[in-house]
Amino acid sequence: MPIAHEFPYFEAPRPRLFAHRGLAQHANLDENTLPGFQAALDHAATHLESDTQATADDVAVLFHDEDLRRVAGIDARVRELSLAEIKAIRLKNGGEIPTLSEALRALPQAKFNLDIKTKPAISPTIEAIEQAHAHERVLVSSFSNPIRKSALASLSRPIATSGSLTTVLGAWISHRLLFGAGFSSIVRDVHAFQIPVRRGPINFATKSFITRAQKHQTEVHFWTINE
């Protein structure tokens, strides 16, 4: 597995500025939409964070929630709707739900951080990345380690990836309780930790934890900072 700095995905300037679902805080923009992503880039974001879900006809769309109630006021699940039905929906600020392919095509220089939400979303997400030849500008992640590993195994070439929750917790236990024993094996197939500052009693934002991760060629990205 190539180390982090061998991937063009990590060549952006520091500090990394990830736009969580695009410029989602803007009063006139919807989250996870092409205008929201473009606005984030216009405001100096170095990376775009988004989520993939699968439609009923197995197309990867950029959408966070399982259903459309919060952002569109519709009591329906993304997985139950066809792409045509998804495209007919307008979000609360008039935005349209994009496919992953549309986003990769519309923003050809943008670097995407993709959280694969469900098992059915794996195949269409990989298909969109492969068709766009976007391996060098996409990082694949998931809260589910089996989903993350399945996605990586389905790709035709290596791609940047971040650790799942279980990976991060394992690394923290190694660092905090085992004096780093086993840390290298835990992070051998990840290039970044994407974590909250705190989770329950655990404080991830310590100099020692960040330093240990960086010594193992693992970047640390905190979410969310200013939402």
Task: Please describe what each predicted stretch is.
Residues 1-227:
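Phosphate-group recognition and catalysis centered on beta-loop-alpha active-site segments
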